[in-house]
């Protein structure tokens, strides 16, 4: 028995000695690495400090026996760095070198890291082809090589990385055909903006077209269409018969409606010869003081009801004044009083009705409107949490100010991106928001961003000079905004969220100058710097903002691509979690409590 105890003690002591020796070797390896590279930021990698608790960007495993992760994103690394030294960290699982200026060919020596699960080399200056065989990374789950200058073909050996769930090779110079990658667990794929040709292989046709945009590849054919091709004639015949029956039924319904309407007009002309209904919708009131509602009979009221109600000025903007109105039935709404409408009544009403038809959880629902010669009003829900502008900049500098956490900022940016993407899909894919800014973003009932003010800019005179900080450089008239200019404005919004700066007029120039000097960390809001564990996510969001604010419109992604980029920052939460929490098309339910929030149109 005593011999067994002694033997166990010897084994334990032996293992402890081995572990101590491993972490000692890892420390020596990283000191050798940092002494052989060019970097503009000072790393506190000192031999006298604990590698596991004090070294910036270094994370050890649970028992501090070896280095588990290197997070060196945006640390000013530059030039052709010898990464073979890092390959000695045999237990390394995470290697993040994003947003530096590292050049040279793909570091093949990293293939010695058999335990690697995440490799991010995005936003660097790597060039040349990838190795033909990448199968040594059997445990790899995330591979991001986007925004470099890699060329050649995409290795088919990537298909052997069976645990891979995220692959991003976008914005490189890859050419040739897309390999057939049979990876069942692959959830995120981005091959956009390369020089790829041919067709999308069947194994990848489950991904959206945005994953392949910017290449010369044929769009994937939906599997259900391929399945039923041999029954084409039967399908066509069935459709033709269905259409004929539908047309006959529609004609019958129209005939009944026409006869019914004529009878109604006769009765109406007898009873009220001087009155005329504006619309057949039951929510549209008669007379000059009625507000037109798109839905919800419980909200029907007229101008006199508004004048009697208790109102509070929430904000004044270049388009008019916004009021919080408490109605007699305890309902609270937001009424925006619009000034300087530059279009005739018919065009105004047509645009407003288009906006009112939009139903999406990340787009503020337009409830109704009023138009007369002297007064133009629009009615929205009241969001008690307030606008993103208030949450970011309100009470700044005060001790009792509640900090806006990164989680909330990320959710608001993501929700807003989804909202703008949905807006861009309306009116045949031609609708433009035209006035994206932080005072038009609110928290919806699920705590995600919800955008208001859709399409209003096209109805007004051009914005004054002091209010055009979000405007894309190619836009000289805000009434003629485009979807790419919306993307630019969204990029400014991202910068505002990351920097916490309320003055956005020169924000793009300032952010680019700071990043160019390789001081990316200086960009971020001081309130965010306390959250060191999310610095990598903030850097990735910064990259999205920089792509969105490209000076040339054709260089900017569309909003569907932007949504995917933001999802990839935290895929397990955003890409899947949002859809499980929020059902598509659900209406917004205002939550929270924050008085005096500026709703500025």
Swiss-Prot record:
It comes from Arabidopsis thaliana (Mouse-ear cress). Belongs to the protein kinase superfamily. Residues 308-569 form the Protein kinase domain. The modification Phosphothreonine is found at residues 408, 478, 549. GO terms for cellular component: plasma membrane. The protein kinase domain is predicted to be catalytically inactive. LRR repeats lie at residues 91-114, 115-136, 139-161, 163-184, 185-206. The modification Phosphoserine is found at residues 310, 387. The chain crosses the membrane at residues 239-259. It is a single-pass membrane protein. It comes from the Eukaryota. InterPro entries: At_inactive_RLKs (IPR050994), Kinase-like_dom_sf (IPR011009), Leu-rich_rpt (IPR001611), LRR_dom_sf (IPR032675), LRR_N_plant-typ (IPR013210), Prot_kinase_dom (IPR000719), Ser-Thr/Tyr_kinase_cat_dom (IPR001245). This is Probable inactive receptor kinase At5g53320.
